[in-house]
């Protein structure tokens, strides 16, 4: 039976069991790899920590266990580790009532989820869906275990043949020509080439790189593009590049950024950045300078993003392959 409630008093023991069954080396190694990547690119820190939040939570629990022999009770009252604790408890509860083959399959899936944020999002969404129906006393089955289909979850007592649930975790990059990680990697390549620009910059300067489709795939080509961008930004005038990319450079009043560093409303931050860069919902970053200025960097594609089309194309394909006319179906994303 899927666990839907967990007391804080049980968190230390739940972690101990989860670490023994899954292996704490999976989150230890993952966090070690992420820290190495962050050391290589200062702009990756927040993004990778957000994308791998559970791995960081589990690693904190591992470190505390190594130091104290078990998780101290005061840490069990820390809300920041509740997502990891609930994930561990639910995975264990499923494995305990599953045939050995399915339990091992789930264990391997958890291993993969620590390596791939998209897989972790998908697995957590399935657990959330299962929790929703379990708390309403519905009878659940996993088609992977029963062979009743290729969808994620079956609610057996809804409708004459049950209700098929298919979960699709949609990331913020869906349908975008420029993904966030790509932009951050490019900013890391650009960083050494904008030092002369930001040194002593006391006003606002916006630089918008527009590529015809996507950023170059080869590292050498991206590095060359970063060098070109750095030189153009330093010159203070926009330019067109032979490959069709363009760079627009313009000054803005730095005071327009206002209280961006202290605001907790993402919508306000996005609106302000869009205003100073004259773009709309693009991958952008603002770097403050010691002289009181700011450099706003934006990477965008000349081709339109197609978020809604990408989502509905995926759902349409999944409906054809995973759902049937004989049983009710539901998508969660």
Question: What does each model-found stretch correspond to?
Answer:
Residues 2-16, 23-25, 38, 42-46, ...:
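Metal-dependent nuclease catalytic core centered on acidic motifs
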Residues 21, 26-123:
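Interdomain/boundary linker segments immediately adjacent to catalytic/signaling cores
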Residues 120-139:
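Short N-terminal edge-element motif at the start of the domain
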Residues 133, 153-155, 161-169, 295-296, ...:
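Conserved catalytic cores of phosphodiester-cleaving nucleases, focusing on short active-site segments
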Residues 139, 152, 162-163, 330:
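Beta-sheet entry/capping signal
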Residues 155-164, 319-327:
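Active-site beta-strand-loop-beta-strand hairpin of nuclease catalytic cores
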């Amino acid at each position: 039976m899927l666990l839907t409630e967990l007391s804080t008093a049980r968190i230390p023991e739940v972690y101990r069991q989860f670490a023994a069954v899954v292996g704490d080396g999976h989150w230890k190694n993952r966090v070690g790899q992420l820290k190495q990547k962050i050391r290589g690119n200062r702009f990756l820190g927040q993004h990778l920590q957000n994308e791998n939040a559970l791995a960081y939570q589990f690693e904190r629990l591992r470190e505390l266990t190594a130091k104290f022999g078990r998780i101290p009770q005061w840490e069990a009252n820390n809300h920041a580790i509740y997502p990891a604790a609930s994930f561990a408890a639910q995975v264990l509860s499923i494995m305990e009532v599953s045939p050995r083959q399915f339990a091992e399959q789930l264990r391997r899936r958890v291993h993969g989820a620590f390596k791939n944020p998209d897989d972790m999002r998908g697995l957590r969404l399935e657990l959330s869906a299962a929790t929703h129906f379990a708390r309403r006393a519905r009878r659940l089955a996993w088609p992977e275990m029963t062979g009743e289909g290729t969808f994620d979850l079956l609610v057996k007592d809804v409708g004459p043949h049950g209700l098929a649930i298919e979960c699709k975790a949609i990331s913020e990059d869906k349908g975008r020509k420029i993904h966030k990680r790509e932009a951050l990697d490019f900013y890391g390549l650009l960083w050494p080439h904008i030092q002369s620009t930001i040194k002593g910059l006391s006003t606002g300067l916006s630089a918008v790189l527009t590529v015809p489709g996507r950023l170059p795939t080869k590292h050498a080509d991206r590095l060359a593009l970063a060098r070109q961008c750095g030189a153009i930004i330093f010159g203070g005038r926009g330019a067109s590049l032979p490959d069709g990319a363009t760079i627009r450079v313009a000054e803005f009043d730095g005071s327009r950024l206002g209280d961006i560093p202290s605001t907790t409303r993402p919508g306000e931050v996005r609106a302000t950045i869009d205003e100073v860069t004259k773009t709309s919902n693009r991958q952008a970053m603002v770097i403050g300078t010691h002289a009181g200025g700011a450099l706003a960097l934006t990477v965008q594609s000349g081709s339109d993003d197609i978020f809604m089309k990408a989502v509905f194309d995926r759902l349409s394909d999944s409906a054809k392959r995973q759902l049937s006319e004989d049983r009710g179906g539901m998508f969660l994303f």
